[in-house]
Amino acid sequence: MKSIPNVLTLANAALGCGALFFIAILDFDTATLCVLLAAVFDFFDGFIARTMGWTSRFGAELDSLADVISFGVVPGALTTVMLTTMNVDYPWIFFGFIITLASAYRLAKYNTSENSQAYFRGLPTPANALLWIGVPHLDYDLTFPFLLGGIVVTSYLLNSPLIFYRFQLKNSATSFVLVLLIMLSFLFLWMRFGHGALSLAIIFYVLFSVTYRLVAKSKG
């Protein structure tokens, strides 16, 4: 039974590998599904391990390796493929893998730092991956400068000192209402924008976290 979290972690990694394959053949719909499921498994492997008291150093290291694949290599490969469709010169094509390097650095820093249970310092790698995997589905003609700017900004956010809100499952009315509002809002976005809703949801999450932090600081 104690191996359940590790099995879920390996499922996360397997889905990341699957996403890479589907990105390579330009099947972004299936790649998006793989990353979304990988994020679900990533949530539940840690949740189950903490709830049942099954946390271990091995599990933490395995989780980081899986996250590098699903939430580091995948968005890096995706942006690289997107750059190739813009007829960008070769040195610039590989610029997308800066996301991979920034993600790996963040995960290593996360594993060796004291982490709060109330918030994340820097944008979580799953959130960043979900942001990028939704981009090809947005009804917007991407330009090279826009994509380049997005790569730089998100790579910074991954390792920034900014505080990001950490949603937690709690037995309280406030928590229930907040989760319900988030689910309804995401459902509305999904009905309107399809898979592109993932990108919009993460953008809203970033804005919400920054606003929440500013309001909290203003109250002392």
Model-derived features: positions:
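Topogenic membrane-insertion module of multi-pass membrane proteins
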Residues: 1-43, 174-175, 190-220
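Short, amphipathic, aromatic/basic-enriched membrane-interface segments that mark the entry/exit
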Residues: 1-7, 60-65, 113-121, 164-174
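Multi-pass membrane catalytic core of lipid/isoprenoid biosynthesis enzymes
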Residues: 4-9, 51-108
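Helical transmembrane-bundle signal
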Residues: 12, 16-19, 74-77, 99, ...
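Active-site His/Glu-centered metal-binding helix of metallohydrolases
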Residues: 14, 40-48, 65, 69
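Helix-coil boundary and interhelical linker segments in multi-pass alpha-helical membrane proteins
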Residues: 18-34, 73-97, 133-148, 190-196
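C-terminal ends of transmembrane helices
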Residues: 46-56, 102-117, 159-167, 209-218
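C-terminal membrane-associated helical module and adjoining short loops/tails
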Residues: 120-220
